[in-house]
């Protein structure tokens, strides 16, 4: 009888679905303003309830499952700890912002763009994935914006979506929303590259480029989402 019970339990355990694979992303961003170009390389690991972001000497580990974020300086071997809302708990409603216009916001003014988006018909391979291009133009008072972005179909069996991560360096919230809405209309496609050009009426053109170099669904190395034991918490 015991043998039958053990065999039944083992058969059930073997039939349990394995967790979806982690997602590993490496991408490069470029910010061009006048004659200056600033290039940054970013690495992300994304798993269930946790992620890691690495940018040069800076390391951030987000543990939604534990309700904490660790931010570290690899060179100094120190880190800070910030509490966040754990997974599954309601997020507090943010306060309603006051009225903001271009005079009060100044450099951070975000115009309200009217977007026209279309598929260009162009295709390319980015990080080993076949991609298609979309182009968009945005008109607003005192500003114009032109955006091109490349998208691929999701990797089979992968539930993590890299789009938020890849779009993070883009400067305009309106551009990001336009990209998110467009990809949602095309089967939840993933963003792998984008170029954003903003032309304010009273400032030089600003260009932001982002492009994925590595995209793979693999299991993260052991300890990826843990703070290295040799690191010390700042202020202690």
What are the language-model segments listed below?
Residues 14-236:
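Extended soluble regions of mature proteins
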């Amino acid at each position: 009888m015991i043998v039958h019970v053990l065999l039944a339990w083992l058969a059930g355990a073997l039939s349990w679905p394995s967790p979806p694979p982690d997602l590993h992303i490496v991408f490069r961003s470029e910010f061009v303003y006048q004659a200056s170009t600033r290039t940054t390389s970013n690495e992300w690991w994304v798993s269930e309830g946790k992620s890691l972001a690495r940018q040069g000497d800076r390391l951030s580990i987000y543990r939604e499952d534990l309700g904490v974020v660790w931010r570290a300086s690899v060179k100094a071997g120190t880190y800070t700890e910030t509490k966040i809302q754990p997974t599954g708990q309601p997020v507090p409603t943010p306060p309603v912002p006051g009225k903001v216009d271009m005079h009060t916001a100044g450099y951070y003014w975000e115009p309200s763009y009217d977007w026209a988006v279309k598929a260009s018909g162009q295709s390319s391979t980015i990080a080993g994935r076949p991609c298609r291009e979309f182009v968009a133009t945005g008109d607003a008072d005192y500003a114009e914006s032109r955006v091109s972005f490349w998208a691929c179909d999701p990797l089979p069996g992968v539930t993590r979506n890299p789009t938020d991560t890849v779009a993070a360096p883009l400067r305009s919230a309106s551009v990001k929303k336009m990209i998110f809405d467009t990809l949602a209309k095309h089967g939840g496609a993933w963003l792998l590259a984008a170029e954003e050009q903003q032309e304010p009426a009273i400032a030089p053109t600003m260009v932001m480029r982002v492009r994925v170099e590595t995209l793979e669904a693999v299991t993260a190395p052991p300890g990826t989402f843990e703070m290295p034991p040799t690191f010390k918490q700042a202020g202690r």
